[in-house]
Structure formats: structure tokens, C-alpha cells
């Protein structure tokens, strides 16, 4: 059985598009970046930790379990934007992204007891239009930025702010479907 180690409804929705049966695991994995950790290393480590935590949870009951872990972060320079802690934090993130190009890093990891982990790191570039204070305040107040890396949902109201995207749209949402499908096929789970 395939398990998705994620609380994200977007990842669940995206994984359903691959027509692979799976169960969702509700896990709490700390997402704290070490001082010497690059954004690439950080997102890959968190995805791997989610997958391993999920495997530890289900392996006794399902020895053939395959667990998918994923993490997405928004990066501007060396600054990593996680999920905003409140509306003011969301406003600050959106101001920083306004009129600039940032990267969205999404790591996907598959683990099981029988083989080494398989992983992919997908880097997309997103250019925001220049947003005025009223646009930022209105978007932050709508609630959509909460729980989203970088304080925006590309598939939601923020889509109108995206001037250019290079990379994986589904990766920016939280699960790059092409790369995930390739990993599942390599693992014999698709």
C-alpha cells in the first residue's frame, strides 16, 4: 500500500490525479532549518524525515508499505519562506515577493523497508507582479495565505499575481506530478 505522509489537502488532491490508491498519514514532523543547511538540503531532509516517520508508523502493520514524503519551500535568495505564522507575517512575505522572481523547491521522497529511498528535487521559478499595499492586505485578509509556503496558493486567488512560471505548476502547489509518477513507477507502485 502507498501512504502519503502529509496533512496537505493539496498534496492529497494532486496524488489522486495519478490514480494510485493511497492512504493519508497525519504526522507532525518538525520543520526547522539548521543554520548551515542550504535550502535544497533543508527541503530534501524534511521530505525524507516525513517519509521515514510515516514508514515507522505503518511498517509493523504493513511490511510492504511505500511511504511518500514531500516538502515545499519558497526561496528568495538564501531566505526560506515557510508558512506564515499570522497575517502580519503573510503580509511581510508577500511584500518581499512582490515584483521579484523566487524559487519554489519541492522535494519528493519514496521510502520502503526493502530498498533505498528514491527522491527528486524540483525547482520552479515564479515571478510575481508588483503588488500594491491594498492588494497585499486584501489577499492576506482572505485567509488563503495561511498554511502555505511563501504565503500564497498558486492554484487560488494568488494565481492572478503570477506574471511568469518556469517549472512545475503542480510542484509549486506541493507535489510535482510528473516526477512523482516517475518515482512511483520506478518503485513498482504505479
From Swiss-Prot:
GO terms for cellular component: cytoplasm. It is an enzyme of class 3 (hydrolase). This is dTTP/UTP pyrophosphatase. It is found in: Cytoplasm. The keyword Manganese does not apply. Its cofactor is a divalent metal cation. It catalyses: dTTP + H2O = dTMP + diphosphate + H(+); UTP + H2O = UMP + diphosphate + H(+). GO terms for biological process: nucleotide metabolic process.
Amino acid at each position: 500500500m502507498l501512504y502519503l505522509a502529509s496533512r496537505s489537502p493539496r498534496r492529497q488532491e494532486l496524488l489522486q490525479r495519478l490514480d494510485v490508491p493511497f492512504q493519508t498519514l497525519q504526522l507532525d514532523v518538525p520543520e526547522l532549518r539548521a543554520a548551515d543547511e542550504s535550502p535544497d538540503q533543508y527541503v530534501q531532509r524534511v521530505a525524507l524525515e516525513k517519509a521515514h516517520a510515516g514508514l515507522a508508523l505503518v511498517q509493523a502493520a504493513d511490511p510492504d508499505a511505500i511511504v511518500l514524503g514531500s516538502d515545499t519551500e519558497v526561496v528568495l535568495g538564501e531566505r526560506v519562506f515557510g508558512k506564515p505564522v499570522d497575517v502580519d507575517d503573510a503580509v511581510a512575505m508577500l511584500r518581499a515577493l512582490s515584483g521579484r522572481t523566487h524559487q519554489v523547491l519541492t522535494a519528493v521522497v519514496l521510502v520502503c523497508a526493502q530498498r533505498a529511498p528514491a527522491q527528486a528535487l524540483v525547482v520552479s521559478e515564479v515571478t510575481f507582479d508588483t503588488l500594491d499595499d491594498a492588494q497585499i492586505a486584501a489577499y492576506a485578509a482572505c485567509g488563503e495565505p495561511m498554511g502555505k509556503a511563501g504565503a500564497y496558493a498558486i492554484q487560488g486567488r494568488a494565481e492572478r499575481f503570477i506574471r511568469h512560471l518556469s517549472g512545475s505548476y503542480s510542484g509549486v502547489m506541493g507535489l510535482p506530478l510528473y516526477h512523482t509518477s516517475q518515482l512511483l513507477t520506478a518503485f513498482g507502485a504505479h
